[in-house]
UniProtKB/Swiss-Prot annotation:
Recorded consequence of changing residue 57 to E: Protective factor against tuberculosis caused by Mycobacterium africanum; correlated with low serum mannose-binding protein (MBP) concentrations
Role, per record: Calcium-dependent lectin involved in innate immune defense. Binds mannose, fucose and N-acetylglucosamine on different microorganisms and activates the lectin complement pathway. Binds to late apoptotic cells, as well as to apoptotic blebs and to necrotic cells, but not to early apoptotic cells, facilitating their uptake by macrophages. May bind DNA. Upon SARS coronavirus-2/SARS-CoV-2 infection, activates the complement lectin pathway which leads to the inhibition SARS-CoV-2 infection and a reduction of the induced inflammatory response.
Coiled-coil regions listed in the entry: 112-130
Residue ranges, compositional bias (Basic and acidic residues): 49-61, 93-102
Organism superkingdom: Eukaryota
Location(s) in or outside the cell: Secreted
Name this protein carries in UniProt: Mannose-binding protein C
Domain notes: The coiled-coil domain mediates trimerization.
Modified residues (Hydroxyproline): 47, 73, 79, 82, 88
Amino acid sequence: MSLFPSLPLLLLSMVAASYSETVTCEDAQKTCPAVIACSSPGINGFPGKDGRDGTKGEKGEPGQGLRGLQGPPGKLGPPGNPGPSGSPGPKGQKGDPGKSPDGDSSLAASERKALQTEMARIKKWLTFSLGKQVGNKFFLTNGEIMTFEKVKALCVKFQASVATPRNAAENGAIQNLIKEEAFLGITDEKTEGQFVDLTGNRLTYTNWNEGEPNNAGSDEDCVLLLKNGQWNDVPCSTSHLAVCEFPI
């Protein structure tokens, strides 16, 4: 059998098959244009954007890495508040008596005795020449005439006070000492008619002259010891003998 008579038939079959594929593809595009693509597959596109962060996961277990080196010490912090006082400790034992060089105590005692003897001699000289002693008081005058304020300042300068008799014996001692009228440490400057000593205490002994005190002239706030031993009120601005008393 000859092959040539079959050639037209073969060509016709191929055309028919090609037409069939074309029609089928076109029909498919008309029916599902968005689904079926008859062309060859395209290349991959670019990666899309990252999605949103997911929820935080649970804390994982510590890793197995090596422990790092210890860091340097931090800065010194501020001092804390003082703590409460501790309880007292036990009482210590009595210490041994101290030692002093030999002869010091006996030397001090002898010096003290010599000083006391010398002071006693000086008192006697003063008493004999210028002053009078009664009990534990020593009355002394320098013979100067001055106002009451100056008498107070003079006595304070020598750590004494203006003579203030507390009894008849002291009043007599001052009387025997003076040759002129002398100020006493008594005034009524704060309250008229209420005579007190220079410390503000009321008097427990007085020896007023007859008719005294009379506050003549309304400014007689100081007191004089007269030569007869009695008292008289006078102005403090007048000048009279200064007599001081020293405690002994």
